[in-house]
Amino acid sequence: LSLHDALPIYTRVTKKLLNLLALKYELDFSQKEFKSFHSHNEKEILKNLTKDTFTKNVVYCSDAGMPCISDPGASLVDWCIQNEVPYDVIPGANAILTAFAMSGFSSTEFTFFGFLDHKGTSRASKLEEVLNSSRVGILYESPHRLLKLLEELNKKEPDRTIFLVKEISKFYQKTYKNSAKNLYEELKSIEIKGEWVVVVEPKEKFGFNLELDDILPLDIAPKIKARRFLKNTYTNLVLFRI
C-alpha cells in the first residue's frame, strides 16, 4: 500500500511512527500531506471531502489501538460507504482482545462497555450493567478516573475479581489481578499513569434462573414471558406490550 495522504488522529505521533519506518525501510514521507482527523473536527473534514480526495491512497490511522474502537473513524467509514469510495480495514493492535486474553478469566464471552460517563446516573446505571452481566465486562479508563472506578467497584462488589492492565504492548505495561477491595487499597497509594483496560469478572449464576435476555427471544405469548420472568425474579415487574 503506497501512501499519498494521511489522516491521523494527531499528526505528531503518526509522523514519529512514519519517520521510524522511513529510516528502517529507506522510505520518504516528507512530501506527504498530513491532516488531523478527530472528534473535534471530523464534521468539518467530512463536509469538505469529495471523491477526488481519494483518487490516490489515503490512510487513516490512530495514535495507538484501532480506529473506530473507542476512537474516531466510524463517520469516515460511513462517508466512504455512502459515497461508494472503496476502502479496506487493516487490523491493528486492539486492547480489548489483548486484555481479555491476558485476564485469565475462563469465560468465552465478553461485553465491551468502552469508557463510562464521567458522572451522573448514566455512569451509575452502566456500572450496574457491568456488574450484573453474566459475561466478562471490559472497560477503558483514563489514569485520572481509574481510582474513582476502583472505589465504586469496592463499594458495590468488594470481593469481585478485577484484572487491570495499563499501556498494553508498551514499555511500561503492567498488570494487576485481585479483588476490587485489594486493588483499590493498592493503587490509591501510588501515582497512576497511562491508559488502562479494566476487565471485570462476570456475575456468578446460581441454579437455573433465567434472565430477561434469555426470556425475551422465546417464541411464546407475551403473558407467559412475563410470568416466567416474575417467577425467576419475584422482585422485578416487567410490562410487555400485548
Describe the residue ranges of each PLM region.
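Glycine/small-residue-rich loop that forms an oxyanion/phosphate-binding "nest" at active or ligand-binding sites
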Residues: 45-90, 94
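A contiguous loop/helix-start segment that scaffolds small-molecule binding in enzyme catalytic cores
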Residues: 32-33, 56-57, 136, 140-242
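Helix-loop-beta element that forms the nucleotide-linked donor phosphate-binding surface
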Residues: 18-27
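Conserved helicase motor
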Residues: 34-43, 115-119
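Alpha-helix capping/helix-boundary segments
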Residues: 12-14, 95, 145, 204
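Class I SAM-dependent methyltransferase SAM-binding "motif I" and its flanking Rossmann-like core
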Residues: 75-133
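Short, small-residue-biased leader/transition segments that mark boundaries at the very start
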Residues: 4-7
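Short, structured surface patches at the beginning of a domain
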Residues: 19-20, 38-51
